Design a protein with these regions (language model features):
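Conserved PLP-enzyme active-site core in the AAT-like
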Residues: 1-159, 163
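Low-complexity, serine/threonine/proline-enriched polar segments
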Residues: 166-168
């Protein structure tokens, strides 16, 4: 980035960065490191595939909203709630940590939203949030992780016992 800024006439240092976290195939970044070292005023973590990260300690430090505020920065995290939590298709959330100008934020938000919202989508985000509130949300995520681990172990066991082409 520094090289490109220097090579570009009239360019100034960026003030905003967008980081895809996690990637579609499950790659997470150390968001604490990014927040503390990336020299920009605001960072947007596009966390479309991982709206569940704040509900399990195994993801601590891997989500945009992990940890406290970052001095002098605004952190945004967007999540496609419909992908992995119980919300209707197209439902998503924007999380903000840090000091923002609410009028400017709301103006930008309203520019990209409908004047005729489909209220069942809005209600489904509220329902998804309520389902994940407190210990219930943590328990749901813990059970999902436990099932995924058991499934992987069972597939591994079946592969070790099989001569079938299915596992090749």
């Amino acid at each position: 980035i520094e090289k490109r800024v220097k090579e570009t006439p009239n360019a100034t240092w960026p003030v905003h960065a967008v980081v895809t976290n996690s990637t579609y195939d499950g790659l997470f970044y150390n968001t604490g490191f990014i927040k503390n070292t990336l020299d920009v005023k605001s960072i947007h973590f596009d966390s479309a595939w991982v709206p569940y990260t704040n509900f399990s300690p195994i993801y601590q430090g891997l989500a945009g909203m992990s940890g406290g505020r970052t001095e002098g920065k605004v952190i945004y995290e967007t999540q496609s709630t419909h992908k992995l939590l119980a919300a209707f298709s197209q439902a998503s959330m924007i999380h903000v940590k840090g000091e923002i100008n609410e009028a400017t934020f709301n103006e930008a938000f309203m520019m990209h939203t409908s004047t005729s919202p489909f209220y069942p989508i809005v209600a489904s985000t509220e329902t998804a949030a309520a389902m994940m509130r407190g210990n219930v949300g943590r328990r749901l995520i813990d059970e999902s992780i436990d099932r995924a681990i058991r499934f992987r172990k069972e597939i591994k066991r079946l592969r070790e016992e099989s001569d079938s082409w299915f596992f090749d």
